[in-house]
């Protein structure tokens, strides 16, 4: 009797039965829970498939439409109006999409059958955010070999490649549909999906039975016919908003593409919503010069930064009393004028018997290097020996101060087939670089002064010139150039540059130069062999010519120029500073002409070594 109270709890058989009952009950609950979860999973998967079937014909982006899943969850077969209104908020309020019936009013029917909304959906889920089931019928489109002349290329060329610019394809105001008659109203709205460019060029689409339209043929990866491409190119670009044009590869590239329109119309691809700045073609503004005396030659006072204008600087053949001369260095830039900031007056006062032979004007400003053709500046003194280069744009005079600034500004190219320029004097044109073999006519491009503005224009025919005087061969290893530097009579130069006194002088190989010849002397002067082109020491600078400052390496390197520039408020030379005229480089902001020349792919960029040279000199 004493053991009876504890017999129930101490009996191992009853204890094991309780454990078995508990385990059985737990297993039943687990099975019920698993069955419930399986049912929920199946129903959820089925619901997602239905939602995906219904939404892929309206949702063209790659992001899931959360608002549509929330709004239309209770019903599985909504009308076409309710599902189509979601396109306005497809990008979560970021992009406003116009309604489809704004452009195609004939395609909307209020009494559509629920089963009709899947018919003819030829692009089922090419943009869907979730991977489709592989059991779906996927096949190659049967129209891959067709080329129908009725392609609606307006919307095809307006197609986009990113979600942020999908809204622009619906802004085409001219939907040219050859099938827009009454027979098309029997088709529901899903057929118009290709009009908005919502297929990303996939080769495989989920095909459903139903009539095919000609817009659906735009999925063909083969190149379009060339006549269709060229006929629709300008029209599609004109109807496109400017804010969505971005340069890049074409949406439908092919070998026969009309490349003649590309510099003016840009490319057809719009890979985003960034503005296209490559199609901006504004006329160049009038040059605003600080010097009022530059009004006649004002267009040459537009100086730009280093390397911006690749073919604009080496044409000036100006001989002043300082002997500034520039020779042609590149045959490919024979029709371009200089962008040099010649906005200062290079007034040189010839004083042959005084120590300060040439007093520079206070408003002297060195021209800014606007061309890779003039990467550095070469001023060669009266001594014809080779010297190590001084820093760029440093005017270094000779040891004899009374000789004046007789220098030669020459531009030589390491890869130029004609490194030596043949300098002759002529009485015809002040600034002419004419290839004698091509008999070309040099004409200024539009941004420069017109021939009506110039007293003696640059347009000179070769037959109007006298036969050039041959130069004695100074360096026998250098071949003579086809480009001849024609320096003209003083009257034409002074009328062309009103602020510059051009005093022509014969240059002799002796170290001391004679007195300067007056300006009225018209006869030909014998070109001396002191005018010879030295080879460019910067041979590693690629195909761009570089000229550098060379002078005697003695202690009197800067004495002559320091004496000549003494007392000038704007120009100060220091014997210690390697680049004394840094503040005098008037580098003006880049103009639209410079932008156009920069965007030209035919122009080459600066060599990295040349760029590093200027960066080292704090230019």
From Swiss-Prot:
This is CREB-regulated transcription coactivator 3. The modification Phosphothreonine is found at residue 160. GO terms for biological process: energy homeostasis; lipid catabolic process; macrophage activation; negative regulation of adenylate cyclase-activating adrenergic receptor signaling pathway; negative regulation of lipid catabolic process; positive regulation of CREB transcription factor activity; positive regulation of transcription by RNA polymerase II; protein homotetramerization. Residues 443-454 have a biased composition (Pro residues). The gene is Crtc3. Residues 129-148, 375-478 are annotated as: Disordered. Residues 380-401 are annotated as: Required for interaction with PPP2CA and PPP2R1A. Its main location: nucleus. Transcriptional coactivator for CREB1 which activates transcription through both consensus and variant cAMP response element (CRE) sites. Acts as a coactivator, in the SIK/TORC signaling pathway, being active when dephosphorylated. Acts independently of CREB1 'Ser-133' phosphorylation. Enhances the interaction of CREB1 with TAF4. Regulates the expression of specific CREB-activated genes such as the steroidogenic gene, StAR. Potent coactivator of PPARGC1A and inducer of mitochondrial biogenesis in muscle cells. Changing residue 391 to A/E: Abolishes phosphorylation. Abolishes interaction with PPP2CA and PPP2R1A. Slight increase in phosphorylation at Ser-273 and in the interaction with 14-3-3 proteins. It comes from Mus musculus (Mouse). Residues 455-478 have a biased composition (Low complexity). Changing residue 392 to A: Abolishes phosphorylation at Ser-391. Abolishes interaction with PPP2CA and PPP2R1A. Binding, as a tetramer, through its N-terminal region, with the bZIP domain of CREB1 enhances recruitment of TAF4 to the promoter. 'Arg-314' in the bZIP domain of CREB1 is essential for this interaction. Interacts (when phosphorylated at Ser-162 and Se-273) with 14-3-3 proteins. Interacts with YWHAE. Interacts (when phosphorylated at Ser-391) with phosphatase PP2A catalytic subunit PPP2CA and regulatory subunits PPP2R1A and PPP2R2A. The modification Phosphoserine is found at residues 4, 62, 162, 273, 329, 332, 370, 391, 396, 410, 443. One of its GO terms (molecular function) is cAMP response element binding protein binding. There is a cross-link at residue 232 (Glycyl lysine isopeptide (Lys-Gly) (interchain with G-Cter in SUMO2)). Changing residue 62 to A: Reduces interaction with 14-3-3 proteins without affecting the interaction with PPP2R1A.
